[in-house]
Amino acid sequence: MFSPSKFRKQVNESESVSNCESTTSNSRRILDQHAGLPISSAFRTEASDIGHHFSTKMYFKILSPNNVFALMGDNEFKTSFKIFTIFEPTSTPNGKIQSLITISYKINNVLFKMEKEIFIEKVNIFSLELHIFNFQSTNRSNPASESIHQLDLSSEALVTSTLNIRGNKITTTLRPRTSPYKRAGDASMSREDLRSPDSVSTFTTVLHVFHKVFQVAATYTIRENRSERQTKVKLESLERRLKANEKARKEIEAEAEKWKDRATRNSKRLPELELELAETVQAKEEWQVKSQEMEIQNKQLVEELNEVQKKLEEIENSQKTFHQKVVSTLNLDEEYFQNPDEEQDGSLSQFNMDVLEQEIVKYQEKCISLKQENEILKEKLQQLSSSLTVNQNHVSTLMDHLEINKEQSREIQGICKKEIAIRQDHENRINHDVTLLNSLINEQKMELEMLKAEIRCLRSYSQEMSQSNKNNIILLKSAETERKSLLETLTVLLNSEEEATENNVKRTIRDLVRERDTEQTKRFEAEKAASNAEGVLLEQAKQQRNALFRARVSEEEYSKSMEKIEELEQELLASDLERKNLEHKIASLENCISKVSQLLNVNVGGVFDAIFDRIEELIAQESVYRVVVNENRLISENIFRGLQSVRKDFQSGKSGGGSDKKQPASPVAAAAKIIQERHTLKTIDKMDKLNKDLLATMTIETLKAADIEKTNLKKRMNEQDARIRQLEREKKEGERIRSIIAKWEKRNIPKTEKSSPMKKVPPIENFRAKSQTSITGLSPVL
């Protein structure tokens, strides 16, 4: 007989001594053949290698449950699980094969070793040829590793644990395809062999294994049913989300169309504003040209006034000389008449004296009247000079106003350019927002398509699960029939009439089953708790990752929203400054209008009708004054010609008096010349009127320009107010769209995220709402 203790001593001695020759050549050859073979690969030896007791060949296959355990483990376990035969197998008198093997495996990079004394027995139970291991000896641990865990391959709890972890593979590998035994029986196995106690123990182990397999299959069918219900619930929730997403998509598309319409309207308004700007620039240039022309005309009129004054001075000088000459001539005549010649007659001299006296009286009266008229004309000249100074002052003030208006027009042009640039920026931003909304709509469409595809996959998966459940039900029914057949065979085997009684067999079976059940339940509960703990930890890790990702996204969006708020505040400040500048310009224009009304002696009172009436009167008088000016020019030319003729006549009369003293100068011509001087006074009056008309026309033009600028400013202010209202409406619509998107995002948040530990983190929509409220609280312009 074989003794394990003696063999262990021999093995230790052989390991301590190098190149030991105690082992036989056959054992060395078997070790070399089977060293390092994994348990999943079956090995075979011939009968000649085992011993001389068998003349036929026998095959040794390492099968259930060990190869199942190796197949179901991870890759590390599969590659490291190895079995070695230590000595040459020997046959016992009972027909069994006795051997000692070592089993080694790794779990988590920890090496485990164990030794087993085995008896191999050939039993034909299934359609396949199955060799069962009867592990009769206790575990013998390696002395080098005392604290290492030892795996008991004889226990069925390990098999059930692996079945719980890898249930699908176990059901496919261990599911019996035929009846538990052949009813007809094999030629190599008799009915007496079936009733032996060893065969009964083997059958009990096999029955226990199949019972556990069926339990695992039932648990997996329950789990599949649960997963089927969960998939149905998920399908319903996904359909609800699809409907909500479609509604939100329609609303967003409508909002995007509105934004597009507004963008087109703004683009249509731009050319109109540009045309208005061009018109204002042209009007300003025309006004500048007219002002230059009026300045030139004013200079010409001043030059003409100076020429007329010079002519008046010359006329006064000529009048004085003429008066002196008349006096001198009169004195000469008196002397001549006081000392008459004796040759002349008395009657003729007396007649001439009477005529001269009458003429002199008339002439003196005319001189007195002319002196009075000259005094009146001098007073009028003084008035004209004072009015000229006043007019010059008015012209200087008007020129100052013109320069101020030029500066204001330049500022207005700059403001208009800035406003156009700002409007273009706003339109670009609106277009950018429209593109973003379109991209969001496209992304949501893609998400909807993805959700539809997921729903289709889930439906197909649910159909597959239902089919697999049906197949599992069929397999369970077949397993139940097979279990019934096994129970029948066991009843047949237990009702045998051999040495072992039925009560003893039942007691042993019950004890074994109780022990195994208790161990299996404990291990199953421990493994179940471990798997539940692992699932909880995985869910917590996923929730934490999702929460961190959402927190990062919220921080990024918060920073972006703060940047947008700063930009909007800067735009607000710029718009406030522009409004203040416009108000200042309006006030300056109102002051200009009040000054113009004071100059025209018109009470405006907030209404410009009086100014416009006065302007129309001055325009009507302008045409009349132009006609009068032309007439005055003709009259002045005629007067000048008459004066020249009078001067010539006077010179000719003087020369005649020197040669012939009897011929006196004609006083009628002198009187005619004096009468013509009255026309000069009329020309002076007309020049005064012309100066007044010039002032009136200048003031009218300045008032017209100021009125045009004021109307333009009012239009711009109204346009700015309309633009501000439109921006407020667009802002409200944008807030409404954001609220819709926020609601949609809240609906799409899964339950796992809602129950995550990061509930206290505020969502992105709160930051958006806060930023928007802060913007609206700054000023009502936005």
Curated annotation (Swiss-Prot):
The keyword Coiled coil applies. Keywords: Coiled coil. Residues 1-25, 175-195, 748-782 are annotated as: Disordered. The keyword Coiled coil applies. Residues 223-331, 348-398, 428-601, 699-743 form a coiled coil. Residues 769-782 have a biased composition (Polar residues). InterPro entries: CCDC170-like (IPR039139). Residues 13-25 have a biased composition (Low complexity). Residues 183-195 have a biased composition (Basic and acidic residues). PANTHER family: COILED-COIL DOMAIN-CONTAINING PROTEIN 170 (PTHR18863:SF6), TSEC-2-RELATED (PTHR18863). This is Uncharacterized protein C27D6.1. It comes from Caenorhabditis elegans. The lineage of its organism: Eukaryota, Metazoa, Ecdysozoa, Nematoda, Chromadorea.
